């Protein structure tokens, strides 16, 4: 009888721990993928500093086609109106495979000396910055790093 109780408890603990472990793995994959966006940040910032407009696509930013900018968890890095869209694929968990995380440039339009700041996912820009580009993030906030979540004031 005691053995059945122990086995039942182990089963319950395993059922509770498995989703938590999977969530942690997904968050780690997202965090591991984020540095790939650094490839595009400087070229986009350079275009802004020279033209006061954001590059409409990869080519205008001086980057290869989206499918050529990849890593273990990202299958494409797409620039659209200055925003960097990371499409998850390759070895990414099936929960985020095909999903997108967007990093958008934020600028102070009337103070061009202020450098571009990057806003991750559903986060909001600091005042008085203006976010450029559209947010295509479709990954649930629970999986995103805290800095990428849509926190309210």
Model features per residue range: what roles?
Residues 26-55, 65:
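Membrane-proximal N-terminal amphipathic helix
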Residues 49-153:
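Periplasmic/extracellular, small/polar-rich flexible segments of pilin-like filament-forming proteins
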Residues 1-32, 36, 40:
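N-terminal single-pass transmembrane signal-anchor helix
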